[in-house]
Amino acid sequence: MTDPLPIVPFTRPARATVRLPGSKSITNRAMLLAALSGGSTTLQGALFSEDTAIMAEALRRLGFAVTEDEARATIRVDGSGGAIRAASAELFVGLAGTAARFLTAFCCLAPRGRFALDGVEQMRRRPMKSLLDALEALGASIQSSGGFFPLVIDARGLRGGEVSLDATESSQLLSALLMVAPLASGPVSIRLTDPGYRREYVTMTLRMMEQFGQPPARISADGLLVQPPHGTPYRGAGALYPVEPDASAASYFLALPVVTRGTIELPGLSGPSLQGDAAFADRLARVGARVSTTPAGTTCSFDRGAARAQALRDDFHAISDTFLTLAAVAPLLEGETHISGIAHTRKQETDRVSAMVAELRRLGQDVHEEPDAITIRPRPLRADVAIETYGDHRFAMSFGILGCHDLRGDGTPWLAIRHPKVCAKTFPGFFTALEQARLDSTASS
C-alpha cells in the first residue's frame, strides 16, 4: 500500500455490497467475558485487527488458551471462571483502549501475582486515573506513572465496597469495573461523579454480562449509582457467541452514497443492536439518505439526481466515534454542519476535535472550533491535499470516504491519506473494501 495513498474517486454512483468486519467493542468484551466464564466459548464473526490481537495475546500471557481462525472469523477462549493461571506477566496494550482498561481491572482480580502493563506513547496519555483510584479503593495495589501507563499490579484480589468513578472521559473505565465486580469478594457499588458518560457503551457491557449469565445490574433513576450483580458466576454464552458487524465501521460505507450517490448494501447489519453507533443511520436519514434495515442487513441510498444532502445540527455524544464520518463529508452538504457533545474525544487516539478542524481547514473549509463542538461551513474543496491521520484509524477511514467524491470530474485522485495502514487497528481491509466497492460500482453501471 503506497503512502500517502491516493483515493481514486467514484465516477459512477455507488452500487456495491460491503461485508463489514465484526465489532471491536463486542469482540474484546466477549473475549474477556469468556475468560471470566467456565468452559469454552467460540466467538463467531469476530474482528481480526490490532486491537483484538492485543487482547487475545494478553489473555494467552495470563494463561488462557485462545485459538484464532481468521479464515472462519472465529476466536475460541477456554475460560477458567476468572482464575488467572499465570503468576506474573508483561502485557502490551498498544493503543487499544478496551484492552488497556479491561485487562487492568481483570489483573486486579487475581489473588496473587505481579502484572506489568504498558502501551505506546499515545496510550500513556489516555485517561486511566479514575479507574485506578476505584480499583485501589477496592483493595488493589497499583504502581502507575501519575495515574497513567505504565502500570505494575501486585494482585491480591478485590474486596467489595462503594467507589466513586468519573467515566466522562471514557466509558471504558466504567465497563472495566462492571465486568470484574461480580467476582469481587463482596458487593460493589459504583457512584458516578458526573452523569455525562456514554451510557450506550455501558448498556452494551451490561447486556453482554447478562448474556454470559449475570443478573441485571441495579441502576438509579439518575444513572449515577450502578450496583453490578455479585455472587453469581459467569457462564459461557453458549458454544457459539455471534459478534455483530461493526456499527462504527458501517458509518463510513453508509455515508458513501451521500458522497457518490447510489446504493450500498451492508449484509448482517440488522437490529436490534448492542451498539449505540447503529444510530448513525438515523442521522444519515435526516440529511436526506434513504436507509432501510431488514433482518438481512442495512441498505443506504442517495439519488443521483437529488439535490445535495442537507447539513445537520446534532449532539453526537452518544455516537462520538462517528462524528468524524459526518465531519469529513460535511463539505459536500448543503448548509452549516454543527456537531456537539464531543469534548471527550480530545483524549482518545488524538485530540480528534482539533485534528479534524486542522484537516478541514487544509481542505479550504470554514471551521469554527469550540471546546465541545465544531461548526463546518462548506467552501470549495482544495485539491492535492494529503490528509494527516495522527495515528488515528478513524481519520484515515473518514477522509477516505470524502476522497471518493469526483472533485475534478475526470476520476483522477485529488486527496491522499498519509499512513493508511493505521486502519489495521480496527478495520485492516478498509481500503481494499473501498476500492472493491468502486470497481463493483463501475462494473454495474
Task: Spell out what each predicted region is.
Residues 1-445:
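Short, structured segments at the rim of ligand-binding sites
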